[in-house]
Amino acid sequence: MNTYPVAELTINYDGMSTRLMYTAAQLVIVSDAGYKLWYVEIDGMTQHSLLHMFNQTDQIGVALDGVTADGKHFSGTGFFHPNEQHYAAAIRGDSELPGF
């Protein structure tokens, strides 16, 4: 498992693009038994209405673009899982994440 701090993260959903505001985020890449999966953990989100919106819908698919703290760009698609109580979210990857 490899973890990368995320400096910037933008999600695209329902024809809109939103740069996420948070206190900490990390990209996690899990490689096990010949397969890879990835997800992004996001903590301290200040966009409460965005968390609420995703909590109220079953349309949670997003495209995302990000930059790790060391400047590596990444893009992929995934599913946005909000945690309103803790002002947090997780994006579970739905496709390969090129370059990782």
Language-model-derived ranges and their functions:
Residues 1-34:
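Solvent-exposed edge beta-strands and adjacent loop segments
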Residues 2-5, 45-47, 79:
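Signature of dsDNA virion morphogenesis modules
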Residues 39-41, 63-65, 88-90:
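Beta-strand secondary-structure signal
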